[in-house]
Amino acid sequence: MAEDRDWQRLDKWLWCAHFMKTRSDCARLVEEGLVRINRQPTDKPHARLRPGDVLTLPLRGEVRVLRVLAMARRRGPAPEAQALYQEVEEAPGADGLRLA
């Protein structure tokens, strides 16, 4: 089912972008307060994510900062998932973020 909205649930976007194997794992990461949207902590998997937002999240022992480029239509292959975001070089405001 294609979504024509200008936003997408945070947990679904993380899952479609291949950051976790299951959507439940994505929701758990968010619920633990480990994710920030535009430097603001969130613990709500249903938070609205839009193109241009900046995500800060801990993955595999490091803090990653990503700019959202597009909303996901489905959980597709890796090249399709990688086109959803762009790595941001600096990690501003990531100082207080706990690593999972």
Where do the protein language model's features map onto the residues?
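Glycine-centered, phosphate/nucleic-acid-interacting loop/turn motifs that mediate DNA/RNA or nucleotide
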Residues: 33
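Strongly charged
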Residues: 1-12, 16, 24, 28, ...
